[in-house]
């Protein structure tokens, strides 16, 4: 596999995360939603439970920056909540529940990328 730029690596990680979420039965509502305060990587929904799921994707090639749990700081969770609130404020549809998830994608250690899905982080 050729060396990827940070942007290419991030895009590949997000694509693998979207495929994982779709495989879990979630419907992808939007990707890379941006506002002046930041970006939400993936917004999905569980139709059966009417739950909207905001997903932060962390793509790594190794453990140099710590594991997935270290990548999701209290500040990061606060930022995700704020962004989720802003997205929800612009929607006409009501949701029964809201969930924040983090998906870690590790590329390069083996032939198949490793995906870790932490549900309900905040």
UniProtKB/Swiss-Prot annotation:
What is an example of a GO molecular function annotated in this UniProt entry?
Answer: nucleic acid binding
Fetch the InterPro entries from UniProt: Restrct_endonuc-II-like (IPR011335), tRNA_endonuc-like_dom_sf (IPR011856), UPF0102_YraN-like (IPR003509)
SUPFAM superfamilies tied to this protein: Restriction endonuclease-like
Would you identify the family this protein belongs to, as annotated?
Answer: Belongs to the UPF0102 family.
Which HAMAP family does the protein's record reference? UPF0102
Protein name listed in UniProt: UPF0102 protein MMAR_1812
Provenance organism = Mycobacterium marinum (strain ATCC BAA-535 / M)
For this protein's source organism, the top of the classification is: Bacteria, Bacillati, Actinomycetota, Actinomycetes, Mycobacteriales
